[in-house]
From Swiss-Prot:
Its EC number is 3.4.21.-. The keyword Protease applies. This is Kallikrein-13. The lineage of its organism: Eukaryota, Metazoa, Chordata, Craniata, Vertebrata. InterPro entries: Peptidase_S1_PA, Peptidase_S1_PA_chymotrypsin, Peptidase_S1A, Trypsin_dom, TRYPSIN_HIS, TRYPSIN_SER.
């Protein structure tokens, strides 16, 4: 897995005929048109929980609204100056129904950096507290968390984002892209990425390749049965290779942490608003 600073280096290697590399799916640029590798343009506002995380007007990552004041994303998307855009379909222009919030707290999972497996993006999950709650509308909705730790391999799920639609060459779409991909078994996932997969991860993709999340999609949702089953984390570069599925953070492993973290911060704010007792 390459950190952001080395994404360009791995891109250069791939263009010159080098072997595939593992890469986090984070990007700091935005561009023209296309679709998620092997995917299609989402029907506008059909993914109302989808968030876009921008820094100085440039796409960094995706995210997912899990509470009117909280967005879930990948821990490796941590960066100063994040702004969260919700109710978006097309980036680069103001749209009716969109809402924008600054981030007041970024809370990566406490084991993300401390864990011996952190170099493999173990515990790659982060909560973002928004400056104020968003208003839920037809364009903006929360997505329920999955409590199911093991869905059947082969289950079709949907991943979405504004990441590059081609790989290794890059092409960033103006509109939100979707791809329907299948869950892979834990055994297959560990065979593909020996020594790198933990119980906190899952794999999804297609045998034939061509459908995948890619750079710029990090932190976005993998939706299975209308619940948040995974968070885009990392995978091989170039994206969409046959038998090289993308790797996602397994959300069901973190439901308790998500709920306790939100409850903790909400309680602290209530105490502050009440003042000294």
């Amino acid at each position: 897995m390459w950190p952001l600073a080395l994404v360009i280096a791995s891109l250069t290697l791939a263009l010159s005929g080098g072997v595939s590399q593992e890469s986090s799916k984070v990007l700091n640029t935005n561009g023209t048109s296309g679709f998620l590798p092997g995917g299609y343009t989402c029907f506008p506002h059909s993914q109302p929980w989808q968030a876009a995380l921008l820094v100085q007007g440039r796409l960094l990552c995706g995210g997912v609204l899990v509470h009117p004041k909280w967005v879930l994303t990948a821990a490796h998307c941590l960066k100063e100056g994040l702004k969260v855009y919700l109710g978006k379909h097309a980036l680069g222009r103001v749209e009716a129904g969109e809402q924008v919030r600054e981030v007041v707290h970024s809370i990566p999972h406490p084991e993300y950096r401390r864990s011996p497996t952190h170099l493999n993006h173990d515990h790659d999950i982060m909560l973002l507290e928004l400056q104020s709650p968003v208003q839920l509308t037809g364009y903006i909705q929360t997505l329920p968390l999955s409590h199911n730790n093991r869905l059947t391999p082969g289950t079709t799920c949907r991943v979405s984002g504004w990441g590059t639609t081609t790989s290794p060459q890059v092409n960033y779409p103006k509109t939100l892209q979707c791809a329907n991909i299948q869950l892979r078994s834990d055994e297959e996932c560990r065979q593909v990425y020996p020594g790198k997969i933990t119980d906190n991860m899952l794999c999804a993709g297609t045998k034939e390749g061509g459908k995948d999340s890619c750079e710029g999609d990090s932190g976005g949702p993998l939706v299975c049965n209308r619940t948040l089953y995974g968070i885009v984390s990392w995978g091989d570069f170039p994206c969409g290779q046959p038998d090289r599925p993308g790797v996602y953070t397994r959300v069901s492993r973190y439901v308790l942490w998500i709920r306790e973290t939100i409850r903790k911060y909400e309680t602290q704010q209530q105490k502050w608003l009440k003042g000294p007792q």
